[in-house]
Amino acid sequence: MSDETTISLEDGYPPLEALTTMVPPADATGFSQSLLTFAAVMTFLIMIVGICGNLLTVVALLKCPKVRNVAAAFIISLCIADLLFCALVLPFQGLRFVQGTWRHGQVLCRLIPFIQYGNIGVSLLCIAMITINRYVMITHHGLYARIYKRHWIAVMIAACWLFSYGMQLPTLLGEWGRFGYDSRLQTCSIMTDDHGHSSKTTLFITAFVIPCLVIIACYAKIFWVVHKSEQRLKRHATKQNSIPNNLRPLASTGSGALPSGAECQPSNRVSSDSSSSFSIDVPETAPSGKQQPTRVKDQREVRAKRNEWRITKMVLAIFLSFVVCYLPITIVKVADKNVEHPSLHICSYILLYLSACINPIIYVIMNKQYRKAYKTVVFCQPARLLLPFGKTNGASSAAEKWKDTGLSNNHSRTIVSQMSGGTGAASGAGTATGTAAVAVMQTPPEVQQAQALEMVSRGPDLISKSNLPQPNVTPPPPSVLTATPNGSNSNSLTLRLPLKKNNHCYTNSGFNSSTPSPSSGLGIGISSSSIYRPGVGSLGSGSASIRRITMVGDDIILEEEELPPTPPATSAPTTPAPPPPSSPLHPLSTDSSTTTISGGAVVAGSSAPKPATPTPHIYMNVDSPKRNQYYMDRNTNAVAPESDSGPANTSATVSISGSKLTAKMKFPKD
């Protein structure tokens, strides 16, 4: 036979290169070489910027205290997802553009799109979680503290990752669509399985459409609440401006005393605090020693709201950038299934990759605190690590929520939890009952030893450290805020803190311009010239100024303005240490001081003071009803005499145990 059939071994056994290479079809030449080169350069550039930016953001959020809050936990999760996308997905996509096809095998052709779509889903879900966090903080701030606790934050973040990757497991296993090489796009993507099923539509609805709708609904509600709040503020400002100047309360009078109750201002701020708060403006001491009259302000509220709104706008910008980067590739794949316009596909892929590196740029542009955090990391400035999210070192929940609002950087915040007084060994005990009984501790003007408020630092993260040079003075361990007793001393600055019961918390009950009365609240006399902080000195010399005293929940918080560059070196006010009791007898039998009940108020006084004899400190613990049981177990309560002054709705109890005196306010249940 002249005609012989030749069988080539290559027809039956393909070369080894074909086992690991998906060669594009002949009609795939629509992707020009210049277009692929441009795409490769942009992909590698985005990869470098994304890795550096997201890694820098994670380190900055973990290192810098002032950006550590609940939203930062979700931002860290978002940055980790983008970091994995840039480090694991973009290198292979860049090589795909360089080589013109996929040359990395079937296994990576399945894993890379699995990681790609998983990280995209995690990013959008984290943005949705941050938006919900903003929504709860602004519109339902009463629930914020109960929802965003440490363990719940971890559960939310874990749910984002598990849901995003769990939705793709059937596709990875080939049970519902499959990951494979798309010859039309020359990339690995989601393909139909042998039964013609694909998970693209379901993943698009569950991982993109639903989170976007949730985000849009939350922001619509946020903008509505903010708009209403701005309208109320404008009406309030118009009403305040219409009041004549001679009728507006001033922070000080000619004698230097603050009008009683003239500075109490209620505030229901839209923030992360779960309870209302009240603030008192203390007139700052000018360098000349004269007190400047100031109007009633609430700058703490303005700063907190402004910071919350700034973070909200930043998250909105992140969401809009994600939508802008993700929508083009979705539209192009639906409108151009046959890849008739290759340049549109290349540009849409570049926009998709850009979403992984644009978030750090938004942080730098829109948030001043993030810029400072980046500088701290880049220039290796010292910064301390904080405790885990949602937890502080012994701080109360109110203080923790206070920290989460991200208040101004130029203010130091100190919690005041105890009040001691040098009134002599008070004797006697009594209980006053009435509709709004009040305990007012008074001492005669002859007794010069002042009452004091011990400022207890609940956690190192709650007090801003001053960068000023420290004087050569050894201050006492705790900061001390001395309070001049209420009496005839005209140089004292009398502050009235009217309190009322509101969901088992002390809040303000409005203005009180009258003298102490059973309905006025708890009176505390504070001298503006006797406020002392270690390393700073006395405020009376013009070295610093306490501008605000605020109670949030169970804690009294002092807010201190930024200090001048060179404060004078002053010494700390010293008080004699309490001596041990000389006899086992009760103070009632050895001292002439008396405790009386007058007009619904408990008044502790002394008819014959002895200035020459050192008197022990008398500690008054002013706490909310939830802490009453603790002090009841520690102190000996006085027997409450019956009172005919009114119904027993509210009671003030003064009890003496040794040299300790405890004043407690009890309220009926709601």
Swiss-Prot record:
It is found in: Cell membrane. Disulfide bonds join 109-188. Disruption phenotype: Mutant flies display an increased sensitivity to cocaine and nicotine exposure. In contrast, sensitivity to the acute intoxicating effects of ethanol is reduced. InterPro entries: GPCR_Rhodpsn, GPCR_Rhodpsn_7TM. The chain crosses the membrane at residues 41-61, 70-90, 112-132, 153-173, 203-223, 314-334, 346-366. Residues 564-584 have a biased composition (Pro residues). The keyword Iron-sulfur does not apply. Keywords: Cell membrane, Disulfide bond, G-protein coupled receptor, Membrane, Receptor, Transducer, Transmembrane, Transmembrane helix. Isoform A and isoform B are expressed in the head. Isoform B only is expressed in the body. Expressed in embryonic glial cells that are involved in ensheathment and insulation of the nervous system. Both isoforms are expressed in glia that insulate the larval and adult nervous system. Also expressed in the germ cells, the gut, and the heart. It is a multi-pass membrane protein. Residues 646-660 have a biased composition (Polar residues). Residues 1-40, 91-111, 174-202, 335-345 are extracellular. It comes from the Eukaryota. GO terms for biological process: axon ensheathment; behavioral response to cocaine; behavioral response to ethanol; behavioral response to nicotine; cortical actin cytoskeleton organization; establishment of glial blood-brain barrier; G protein-coupled receptor signaling pathway; septate junction assembly. GO terms for cellular component: membrane; plasma membrane; pleated septate junction. Signal peptide: none annotated. Residues 267-279, 585-598 have a biased composition (Low complexity). Gene3D superfamilies: Rhodopsin 7-helix transmembrane proteins. Residues 258-302, 461-490, 562-622, 636-670 are annotated as: Disordered. Belongs to the G-protein coupled receptor 1 family. Isoform A and isoform B are required in glia to regulate the acute sensitivity to cocaine and to continuously maintain the proper blood-brain barrier (BBB) function. A moody-mediated signaling pathway functions in glia to regulate nervous system insulation and drug-related behaviors. Galphai and Galphao, and the regulator of G protein signaling, loco, are required in the surface glia to achieve effective insulation. This is G-protein coupled receptor moody. It comes from Drosophila melanogaster.
